[in-house]
Amino acid sequence: VDLATGVITTVAGDGTAAYSGDQVSAVQASLAGPSGVALGGDGVVYVADTFNSRIRSVDPATGQIATVAGDGGTYRYQGPAEPSSPSLSRPAGIAVGSDGNVYMTDSDSHLIRVWNGRSKTISRLSGTGVAQFGGDGGDALAGSLSYPFGVAVDASGTVYVADTFNHRIRVLTATA
């Protein structure tokens, strides 16, 4: 919504619940249950395309949509020995840090993951992949989450997580 005029317009999605590919006009692209949106410092709009298991970006200069994380496959984290996977399982919450990294909830895998904008890689930031509560005061990678649906990051890089099914807001800091 343009606050000056009160006009609402569509930035992404054609109203069809599907996946229609990348490098097309964002308003002609299909999304399936978008549930999170965040704005990068460079004006890029990031969308949690939840039921397509992807994080998408809309370029402000071209209006084109692209996938930045997720490949449409269903991801189920199996443990720390497992190689990193580009797949996501129902990403919902999304936030962009001042460093340009995109933080996301990998909700059905019970993880918080981060996409590094420079290296174009995705890694696990928190969660064990098991829906339970645990790990307060310890290593974030050993801390358990249960269906996290929201994430935010402040200017100092502290990450806040809506640990939805544990009915808690969790904080990930450099010392915890």
Task: Go through each PLM region and give its residues.
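Short loop/turn segments immediately following the C-termini of beta-strands
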Residues: L3, T50-F51, S107, G117, ...
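Gly/Pro-rich loop segments of beta-rich domains
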Residues: T5-G33, T62-A92, S119-F149, T175-A176
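A short loop-to-beta-strand structural motif that recurs across blades of beta-propeller domains
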Residues: V7, S53-S57, Q64, H110-V114, ...
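Glycine-centered low-complexity coil/loop motifs and glycine-rich tracts
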Residues: A18, A48, T105, A131-Q132, ...
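Residue-level detector of Asp-centered blade-edge/turn motifs that repeat once per structural unit
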Residues: L39-D42, V96-D99, V153-S156
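Conserved beta-propeller blade signature
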Residues: V44-V47, N101-Y103, T158-V161
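Blade-level signature of beta-propeller repeat domains, shared across WD40, Kelch, NHL, RCC1
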Residues: F149-T175
